[in-house]
Amino acid sequence: MKYTPLYEEHVKLGAKMVDFAGFNMPIQYTSIKDEVLAVRKNVGMFDVSHMGEVIVEGKDSTKFVDFLITNDFKNLKPGEIVYTAMCNENGGFVDDLLAYKISEEKAMLVINASNIEKDFSWMKKISESFDVTLENKSDEYVLIAVQGPNAQKTLQKITNVDLEQIGYYTFTEGNVLDIKAIISRTGYTGEDGFEIYTTDKDGIIKIWKKLLNLNVIPAGLGARDCLRLEASLLLYGNDMDETITPLEVGIKWAVKFEKDFMGKEALKRQLEEGTSRRLKGFKIIDKGIARHGYKVFKDGKEIGYVTSGTFSPTLNQAIGMALIEKGYKSGEIIEIEIRNKLVKAEIVKMPFYRGSVKSKKKG
Protein backbone atom coordinates (compact mmCIF):
# COMPACT_ATOMS: atom_id res chain seq x y z
CA MET A 1 0.00 0.00 0.00
CA LYS A 2 1.27 3.47 -0.88
CA TYR A 3 0.64 6.57 1.20
CA THR A 4 0.72 10.21 0.10
CA PRO A 5 2.64 12.75 2.23
CA LEU A 6 -0.76 14.05 3.41
CA TYR A 7 -1.86 10.69 4.86
CA GLU A 8 -1.43 11.77 8.50
CA GLU A 9 -3.30 15.01 7.83
CA HIS A 10 -6.26 12.99 6.51
CA VAL A 11 -6.23 10.73 9.56
CA LYS A 12 -6.11 13.77 11.90
CA LEU A 13 -9.19 15.14 10.15
CA GLY A 14 -11.02 11.86 10.78
CA ALA A 15 -11.14 10.82 7.12
CA LYS A 16 -12.51 7.43 6.16
CA MET A 17 -9.58 5.86 4.27
CA VAL A 18 -9.85 3.28 1.47
CA ASP A 19 -7.55 1.51 -0.97
CA PHE A 20 -7.67 3.23 -4.36
CA ALA A 21 -5.30 2.06 -7.12
CA GLY A 22 -2.86 0.82 -4.47
CA PHE A 23 -2.95 4.08 -2.47
CA ASN A 24 -4.52 4.60 0.93
CA MET A 25 -6.78 7.57 0.13
CA PRO A 26 -9.55 9.56 1.87
CA ILE A 27 -13.00 8.67 0.51
CA GLN A 28 -14.72 11.25 2.76
CA TYR A 29 -14.11 13.46 5.81
CA THR A 30 -17.55 14.63 6.97
CA SER A 31 -20.11 13.63 4.36
CA ILE A 32 -19.92 13.34 0.59
CA LYS A 33 -22.91 15.66 0.28
CA ASP A 34 -21.33 18.45 2.39
CA GLU A 35 -18.03 18.13 0.53
CA VAL A 36 -19.71 18.27 -2.90
CA LEU A 37 -21.75 21.35 -1.96
CA ALA A 38 -18.68 23.09 -0.49
CA VAL A 39 -16.93 22.76 -3.87
CA ARG A 40 -20.04 23.82 -5.81
CA LYS A 41 -20.75 26.88 -3.64
CA ASN A 42 -17.41 27.94 -2.18
CA VAL A 43 -14.06 26.13 -2.31
CA GLY A 44 -12.75 22.66 -1.50
CA MET A 45 -9.45 20.83 -1.85
CA PHE A 46 -8.41 17.32 -2.75
CA ASP A 47 -5.24 15.33 -2.24
CA VAL A 48 -4.71 13.85 -5.70
CA SER A 49 -1.05 12.90 -5.23
CA HIS A 50 -1.88 9.39 -6.46
CA MET A 51 -2.08 10.67 -10.06
CA GLY A 52 0.84 9.73 -12.32
CA GLU A 53 3.29 12.11 -13.98
CA VAL A 54 5.57 11.21 -16.88
CA ILE A 55 8.21 13.71 -18.03
CA VAL A 56 9.11 13.58 -21.73
CA GLU A 57 12.32 15.31 -22.84
CA GLY A 58 14.36 15.49 -26.03
CA LYS A 59 14.54 16.78 -29.57
CA ASP A 60 11.41 14.82 -30.63
CA SER A 61 9.40 15.54 -27.47
CA THR A 62 6.60 17.46 -29.22
CA LYS A 63 6.55 15.10 -32.22
CA PHE A 64 6.37 12.04 -29.95
CA VAL A 65 3.53 13.37 -27.75
CA ASP A 66 1.62 14.51 -30.83
CA PHE A 67 1.76 10.95 -32.23
CA LEU A 68 1.04 9.30 -28.86
CA ILE A 69 -2.23 11.18 -28.24
CA THR A 70 -5.36 11.87 -30.29
CA ASN A 71 -5.60 15.61 -29.62
CA ASP A 72 -3.35 18.31 -31.08
CA PHE A 73 -0.13 18.85 -29.12
CA LYS A 74 2.13 20.19 -31.86
CA ASN A 75 0.35 23.55 -32.10
CA LEU A 76 0.19 24.20 -28.36
CA LYS A 77 2.34 27.02 -27.01
CA PRO A 78 4.57 26.38 -23.99
CA GLY A 79 2.35 26.88 -20.92
CA GLU A 80 -0.71 25.30 -22.56
CA ILE A 81 -2.43 22.02 -21.69
CA VAL A 82 -4.67 19.67 -23.65
CA TYR A 83 -7.12 16.96 -22.51
CA THR A 84 -6.79 13.90 -24.71
CA ALA A 85 -7.23 10.20 -25.26
CA MET A 86 -4.23 7.90 -25.70
CA CYS A 87 -5.35 5.01 -27.90
CA ASN A 88 -4.15 1.56 -28.89
CA GLU A 89 -4.00 0.26 -32.49
CA ASN A 90 -7.72 -0.58 -32.36
CA GLY A 91 -8.70 2.94 -31.26
CA GLY A 92 -9.53 1.83 -27.70
CA PHE A 93 -8.44 3.92 -24.71
CA VAL A 94 -5.10 3.02 -23.16
CA ASP A 95 -5.92 6.02 -20.91
CA ASP A 96 -7.17 9.58 -20.92
CA LEU A 97 -4.72 12.22 -19.78
CA LEU A 98 -3.61 15.84 -19.61
CA ALA A 99 -0.59 16.82 -21.72
CA TYR A 100 1.34 19.87 -20.48
CA LYS A 101 3.70 21.58 -22.93
CA ILE A 102 6.61 22.91 -20.83
CA SER A 103 8.73 23.72 -23.90
CA GLU A 104 9.14 22.36 -27.44
CA GLU A 105 11.55 19.79 -25.98
CA LYS A 106 9.81 19.01 -22.68
CA ALA A 107 6.32 17.82 -21.72
CA MET A 108 4.52 16.47 -18.67
CA LEU A 109 1.82 13.83 -19.12
CA VAL A 110 -0.59 13.43 -16.20
CA ILE A 111 -2.15 9.96 -16.15
CA ASN A 112 -4.58 7.94 -14.02
CA ALA A 113 -3.23 6.29 -10.87
CA SER A 114 -4.64 2.88 -11.81
CA ASN A 115 -2.79 2.94 -15.15
CA ILE A 116 0.69 4.25 -14.24
CA GLU A 117 2.70 1.08 -14.97
CA LYS A 118 0.67 0.12 -18.04
CA ASP A 119 0.80 3.63 -19.51
CA PHE A 120 4.51 4.05 -18.90
CA SER A 121 5.40 0.79 -20.65
CA TRP A 122 3.07 1.71 -23.55
CA MET A 123 4.76 5.11 -23.87
CA LYS A 124 8.22 3.50 -23.73
CA LYS A 125 7.28 1.13 -26.54
CA ILE A 126 6.01 3.97 -28.79
CA SER A 127 9.00 6.18 -27.91
CA GLU A 128 11.54 3.75 -29.40
CA SER A 129 11.29 5.39 -32.83
CA PHE A 130 11.66 8.94 -31.41
CA ASP A 131 14.62 10.86 -29.99
CA VAL A 132 13.20 11.27 -26.46
CA THR A 133 13.76 10.18 -22.89
CA LEU A 134 10.85 9.27 -20.63
CA GLU A 135 10.88 9.41 -16.85
CA ASN A 136 8.14 8.11 -14.59
CA LYS A 137 8.06 10.81 -11.89
CA SER A 138 4.80 9.63 -10.31
CA ASP A 139 6.41 8.92 -6.93
CA GLU A 140 8.15 12.32 -6.87
CA TYR A 141 5.27 14.66 -7.68
CA VAL A 142 2.54 15.41 -5.16
CA LEU A 143 -0.61 17.27 -6.04
CA ILE A 144 -3.44 19.26 -4.43
CA ALA A 145 -6.51 20.36 -6.40
CA VAL A 146 -8.22 23.54 -5.14
CA GLN A 147 -11.69 23.70 -6.71
CA GLY A 148 -14.78 25.88 -6.57
CA PRO A 149 -16.07 29.35 -7.48
CA ASN A 150 -13.87 30.88 -4.75
CA ALA A 151 -10.73 28.90 -5.66
CA GLN A 152 -8.92 31.84 -7.28
CA LYS A 153 -9.70 34.30 -4.49
CA THR A 154 -8.51 31.84 -1.84
CA LEU A 155 -5.37 30.52 -3.56
CA GLN A 156 -4.31 34.07 -4.49
CA LYS A 157 -3.71 34.74 -0.76
CA ILE A 158 -0.80 32.29 -0.68
CA THR A 159 0.90 32.64 -4.07
CA ASN A 160 3.05 35.27 -5.80
CA VAL A 161 1.60 34.27 -9.18
CA ASP A 162 -1.17 36.47 -10.63
CA LEU A 163 -3.84 33.77 -11.01
CA GLU A 164 -6.00 36.04 -13.16
CA GLN A 165 -3.36 35.60 -15.89
CA ILE A 166 -3.65 31.80 -15.88
CA GLY A 167 -6.30 30.98 -18.49
CA TYR A 168 -8.31 27.77 -18.48
CA TYR A 169 -6.07 24.83 -19.45
CA THR A 170 -2.86 26.82 -19.07
CA PHE A 171 -0.17 26.65 -16.39
CA THR A 172 2.79 28.50 -14.98
CA GLU A 173 5.64 27.85 -12.57
CA GLY A 174 5.78 29.90 -9.38
CA ASN A 175 5.65 29.75 -5.61
CA VAL A 176 2.78 28.74 -3.36
CA LEU A 177 3.82 30.02 0.08
CA ASP A 178 7.58 29.61 -0.47
CA ILE A 179 7.24 26.28 -2.26
CA LYS A 180 8.18 25.94 -5.93
CA ALA A 181 5.25 24.51 -7.87
CA ILE A 182 3.50 24.12 -11.20
CA ILE A 183 0.08 25.81 -10.99
CA SER A 184 -2.49 24.91 -13.65
CA ARG A 185 -6.07 26.06 -14.17
CA THR A 186 -7.48 22.55 -14.45
CA GLY A 187 -9.67 20.22 -12.44
CA TYR A 188 -12.10 17.34 -12.41
CA THR A 189 -15.16 18.96 -10.84
CA GLY A 190 -16.83 21.23 -13.39
CA GLU A 191 -15.89 24.21 -11.23
CA ASP A 192 -13.16 26.78 -11.70
CA GLY A 193 -10.00 25.75 -9.90
CA PHE A 194 -6.31 25.02 -9.86
CA GLU A 195 -4.02 22.03 -9.48
CA ILE A 196 -0.75 22.52 -7.62
CA TYR A 197 2.09 20.10 -8.50
CA THR A 198 5.31 20.02 -6.49
CA THR A 199 8.12 17.61 -5.63
CA ASP A 200 8.45 19.23 -2.17
CA LYS A 201 6.74 16.67 0.08
CA ASP A 202 7.08 18.73 3.26
CA GLY A 203 5.95 21.76 1.29
CA ILE A 204 2.68 20.13 0.23
CA ILE A 205 1.81 19.59 3.92
CA LYS A 206 2.45 23.29 4.60
CA ILE A 207 0.19 24.27 1.70
CA TRP A 208 -2.56 21.89 2.87
CA LYS A 209 -2.45 23.23 6.44
CA LYS A 210 -2.48 26.84 5.27
CA LEU A 211 -5.50 26.19 3.03
CA LEU A 212 -7.27 24.55 5.99
CA ASN A 213 -6.59 27.73 7.99
CA LEU A 214 -8.20 29.69 5.17
CA ASN A 215 -11.35 27.56 5.66
CA VAL A 216 -10.95 25.50 2.50
CA ILE A 217 -13.02 22.32 2.99
CA PRO A 218 -11.09 19.05 2.50
CA ALA A 219 -12.96 16.74 0.12
CA GLY A 220 -12.39 13.06 -0.56
CA LEU A 221 -12.57 10.75 -3.56
CA GLY A 222 -16.29 10.16 -2.97
CA ALA A 223 -17.08 13.84 -3.53
CA ARG A 224 -14.62 13.96 -6.43
CA ASP A 225 -16.47 11.12 -8.16
CA CYS A 226 -19.86 12.83 -7.62
CA LEU A 227 -18.57 16.17 -8.89
CA ARG A 228 -16.99 14.73 -12.03
CA LEU A 229 -20.13 12.75 -12.85
CA GLU A 230 -22.39 15.80 -12.36
CA ALA A 231 -20.09 17.60 -14.83
CA SER A 232 -20.18 14.52 -17.16
CA LEU A 233 -16.41 14.00 -17.03
CA LEU A 234 -15.19 10.50 -17.85
CA LEU A 235 -13.57 8.04 -15.44
CA TYR A 236 -11.15 5.44 -16.81
CA GLY A 237 -12.17 1.88 -15.95
CA ASN A 238 -15.82 2.94 -15.68
CA ASP A 239 -16.76 5.00 -18.73
CA MET A 240 -13.94 3.86 -20.97
CA ASP A 241 -11.31 1.15 -21.30
CA GLU A 242 -9.26 -0.53 -24.01
CA THR A 243 -12.39 -1.82 -25.77
CA ILE A 244 -14.15 1.57 -25.88
CA THR A 245 -13.20 4.40 -28.26
CA PRO A 246 -13.30 8.21 -27.91
CA LEU A 247 -16.00 8.36 -30.62
CA GLU A 248 -18.32 6.13 -28.58
CA VAL A 249 -18.07 8.28 -25.45
CA GLY A 250 -18.63 11.63 -27.15
CA ILE A 251 -15.15 13.14 -27.17
CA LYS A 252 -14.68 13.30 -30.93
CA TRP A 253 -13.59 16.93 -30.33
CA ALA A 254 -10.41 15.54 -28.73
CA VAL A 255 -9.52 13.48 -31.82
CA LYS A 256 -7.74 15.37 -34.59
CA PHE A 257 -7.91 13.38 -37.83
CA GLU A 258 -5.80 15.89 -39.77
CA LYS A 259 -2.64 14.60 -38.05
CA ASP A 260 -1.09 11.18 -37.55
CA PHE A 261 -1.57 9.39 -34.22
CA MET A 262 -1.67 5.91 -32.75
CA GLY A 263 -5.06 4.30 -33.47
CA LYS A 264 -5.95 6.73 -36.27
CA GLU A 265 -6.79 4.11 -38.91
CA ALA A 266 -9.21 2.26 -36.62
CA LEU A 267 -10.90 5.48 -35.50
CA LYS A 268 -11.15 6.78 -39.06
CA ARG A 269 -12.85 3.55 -40.07
CA GLN A 270 -15.24 3.88 -37.13
CA LEU A 271 -15.96 7.50 -38.07
CA GLU A 272 -16.86 6.46 -41.63
CA GLU A 273 -18.94 3.44 -40.64
CA GLY A 274 -20.51 5.08 -37.57
CA THR A 275 -20.44 3.78 -34.00
CA SER A 276 -22.88 1.10 -32.92
CA ARG A 277 -23.14 2.46 -29.35
CA ARG A 278 -23.00 5.83 -27.60
CA LEU A 279 -22.51 7.10 -24.06
CA LYS A 280 -25.73 8.74 -22.83
CA GLY A 281 -26.68 10.52 -19.63
CA PHE A 282 -29.76 9.49 -17.66
CA LYS A 283 -31.65 10.47 -14.53
CA ILE A 284 -33.55 7.93 -12.47
CA ILE A 285 -37.30 8.56 -12.33
CA ASP A 286 -38.14 5.89 -9.75
CA LYS A 287 -36.12 5.18 -6.62
CA GLY A 288 -32.65 3.63 -6.74
CA ILE A 289 -29.05 4.33 -7.66
CA ALA A 290 -27.56 2.78 -10.79
CA ARG A 291 -23.99 1.48 -10.50
CA HIS A 292 -21.30 0.46 -12.97
CA GLY A 293 -22.21 -2.69 -14.89
CA TYR A 294 -25.99 -2.58 -14.29
CA LYS A 295 -27.95 -3.65 -17.39
CA VAL A 296 -30.05 -1.18 -19.41
CA PHE A 297 -33.27 -2.21 -21.19
CA LYS A 298 -35.73 -0.67 -23.65
CA ASP A 299 -39.09 -2.39 -24.21
CA GLY A 300 -37.71 -5.58 -22.67
CA LYS A 301 -34.61 -5.65 -24.87
CA GLU A 302 -31.14 -5.29 -23.34
CA ILE A 303 -29.46 -2.29 -25.03
CA GLY A 304 -26.32 -1.68 -22.95
CA TYR A 305 -24.97 -1.09 -19.46
CA VAL A 306 -24.40 1.64 -16.91
CA THR A 307 -20.81 2.95 -16.87
CA SER A 308 -21.14 5.35 -13.90
CA GLY A 309 -23.95 6.18 -11.50
CA THR A 310 -24.42 8.07 -8.25
CA PHE A 311 -26.79 10.22 -6.25
CA SER A 312 -26.13 13.86 -7.13
CA PRO A 313 -26.24 16.14 -4.06
CA THR A 314 -26.22 19.22 -6.31
CA LEU A 315 -29.29 18.13 -8.29
CA ASN A 316 -30.83 16.05 -5.48
CA GLN A 317 -31.31 13.33 -8.07
CA ALA A 318 -29.88 9.91 -8.98
CA ILE A 319 -27.95 10.25 -12.26
CA GLY A 320 -25.63 8.21 -14.41
CA MET A 321 -24.11 7.46 -17.79
CA ALA A 322 -24.69 4.35 -19.87
CA LEU A 323 -23.10 2.91 -22.99
CA ILE A 324 -26.11 1.93 -25.08
CA GLU A 325 -27.02 1.08 -28.68
CA LYS A 326 -27.13 4.19 -30.83
CA GLY A 327 -30.37 5.82 -31.86
CA TYR A 328 -31.83 6.67 -28.46
CA LYS A 329 -32.50 10.35 -27.80
CA SER A 330 -32.99 12.70 -24.84
CA GLY A 331 -36.45 12.38 -23.33
CA GLU A 332 -36.77 8.65 -24.06
CA ILE A 333 -37.54 6.35 -21.14
CA ILE A 334 -35.26 3.38 -20.50
CA GLU A 335 -35.14 0.82 -17.69
CA ILE A 336 -32.19 -0.12 -15.52
CA GLU A 337 -31.95 -3.38 -13.60
CA ILE A 338 -31.22 -2.41 -9.99
CA ARG A 339 -31.19 -5.32 -7.53
CA ASN A 340 -33.28 -7.57 -9.78
CA LYS A 341 -35.88 -4.86 -10.32
CA LEU A 342 -36.41 -2.76 -13.45
CA VAL A 343 -36.28 0.94 -12.57
CA LYS A 344 -37.37 3.71 -14.96
CA ALA A 345 -34.90 6.36 -16.10
CA GLU A 346 -34.97 9.18 -18.63
CA ILE A 347 -32.20 9.89 -21.14
CA VAL A 348 -31.01 13.47 -20.64
CA LYS A 349 -28.51 15.81 -22.25
CA MET A 350 -25.08 16.11 -20.64
CA PRO A 351 -23.51 17.70 -18.71
CA PHE A 352 -25.99 17.26 -15.88
CA TYR A 353 -24.60 20.40 -14.26
CA ARG A 354 -22.54 23.38 -15.42
CA GLY A 355 -20.44 24.99 -12.72
CA SER A 356 -18.05 27.94 -12.58
CA VAL A 357 -15.44 26.27 -14.80
CA LYS A 358 -13.80 28.76 -17.15
CA SER A 359 -14.12 27.79 -20.78
CA LYS A 360 -12.62 30.95 -22.28
CA LYS A 361 -8.90 31.51 -22.24
CA LYS A 362 -7.83 34.71 -20.52
CA GLY A 363 -5.93 37.44 -22.33
Curated annotation (Swiss-Prot):
GO cellular-component term (any): cytosol
Domain of life per record: Bacteria
Catalysed conversion reaction: N(6)-[(R)-S(8)-aminomethyldihydrolipoyl]-L-lysyl-[protein] + (6S)-5,6,7,8-tetrahydrofolate = N(6)-[(R)-dihydrolipoyl]-L-lysyl-[protein] + (6R)-5,10-methylene-5,6,7,8-tetrahydrofolate + NH4(+)
Record bears the keyword Transport: no
Record key words, sorted: Aminotransferase, Transferase
EC number of the protein: 2.1.2.10
Keyword Transferase assigned: yes
GO MF terms, alphabetically ordered: aminomethyltransferase activity; transaminase activity
Cystine residue pairs: none
GO biological process terms on file: glycine decarboxylation via glycine cleavage system
Protein family (similarity comment): Belongs to the GcvT family.
Subunit organization: The glycine cleavage system is composed of four proteins: P, T, L and H.
Role noted for this protein: The glycine cleavage system catalyzes the degradation of glycine.
NCBIfam families (alphabetical): gcvT (TIGR00528), PRK00389.1 (NF001567)
Name by which UniProt lists this protein: Aminomethyltransferase
Organism: Thermosipho melanesiensis (strain DSM 12029 / CIP 104789 / BI429)
Encoding gene, per UniProt annotation: gcvT
